[in-house]
């Protein structure tokens, strides 16, 4: 039995589906009164990351835990009570229950010195997990295609508007598809090499956002105009809190060598063209 925490979220659902495809029994942790329904054919454990007793019940009889739990964009949760205290509680409950392996979803940007609170807390939880003496795998994915491309490209392009990019948009990033991260998370449960390791994960290529726009042009068969703004200026259709994050992508490159991980875990990586074609086709359907 494998417990998935965060299973009603986008990434968690994909991980659950991957595990079920492999023929595994899956239990999912669902908050009391949650409106989000988990995938059918899973066992449901009702509980909360701040309820230690419920976590111990959820971990009973489980050999591995995969967690994607993180503070949501809505509601009253905070980084401190979900990402920090909640994950601490989960690690402690898994240890007490004799869980053999815990897979934790962090981020490539995790650092205890980061100016971003979430990235600082992710790094703290990584340290707690390493010091716990539990067998573990830490996943450090790069930025998600599924988050950034719809927000920065599709919101404008699919409505016939110019895509607004920050600066020259020449920095290169190995964006990763959620489905690929889900495949790595599931594979880590069964791969001995994953134990007590940190997997830095990205897509097959480091690309610029201009490259991404070009991929959508190829997928849709028509040009997409681009306009540029200075860092900090408004980006039409994009929430204001994201403007600074979008600008930060123009401050560094984040290539991720993937040959070794791709071969070790048997994951076929999604290219920007693969992703754009699927998104354009879904919109046209």
Question: Which sequence ranges carry the predicted segments?
Answer:
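Short glycine/proline- and acidic residue-enriched helix-loop micro-motifs
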Residues: 70-74, 259-262
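Short, conserved SAM-binding segment of the class I
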Residues: 86-89, 93
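N-terminal Rossmann-like NAD(P) cofactor-binding module of classical short-chain dehydrogenase/reductase
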Residues: 59, 63-66, 83, 103
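Conserved active-site and cofactor/substrate-binding residues in soluble primary-metabolism enzymes
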Residues: 85, 176, 207, 267-270
């Amino acid at each position: 039995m494998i417990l998935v925490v965060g299973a009603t979220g986008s990434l968690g659902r994909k991980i659950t589906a991957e595990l079920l495809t492999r023929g595994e029994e899956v239990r999912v942790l669902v908050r009391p009164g949650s409106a989000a329904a988990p995938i059918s054919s899973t066992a449901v454990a009702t509980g909360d990351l701040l309820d230690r007793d419920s976590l111990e019940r959820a971990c009973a009889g489980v050999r591995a835990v995969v967690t994607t739990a993180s503070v949501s964009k809505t509601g009253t949760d905070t980084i401190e009570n979900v990402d920090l205290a909640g994950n601490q509680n989960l690690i402690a409950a898994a240890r007490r229950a004799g869980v053999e392996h815990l897979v934790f979803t962090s981020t490539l940007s995790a650092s205890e010195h980061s100016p971003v609170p979430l990235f600082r807390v992710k790094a703290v939880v990584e340290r707690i997990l390493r010091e716990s003496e539990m067998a573990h795998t830490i996943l450090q994915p790069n930025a998600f295609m599924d988050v950034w491309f719809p927000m920065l490209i599709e919101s404008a392009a699919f409505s016939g508007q110019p895509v607004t990019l920050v600066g020259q948009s020449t920095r290169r990033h190995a964006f990763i598809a959620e489905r690929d991260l889900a495949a790595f998370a599931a594979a880590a449960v069964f791969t001995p090499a994953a134990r007590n390791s940190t997997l830095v994960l990205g897509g097959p290529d480091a690309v610029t956002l201009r490259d991404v726009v070009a991929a959508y042009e190829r997928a849709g068969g028509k040009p997409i105009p681009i306009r540029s703004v200075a860092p900090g200026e408004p980006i039409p259709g994009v929430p204001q809190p994201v403007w600074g994050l979008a600008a930060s992508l123009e401050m560094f490159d984040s290539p991720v060598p993937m040959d070794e991980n791709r071969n070790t875990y048997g994951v076929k990586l999604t290219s920007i063209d693969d992703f754009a074609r699927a998104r354009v086709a879904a919109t046209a359907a």
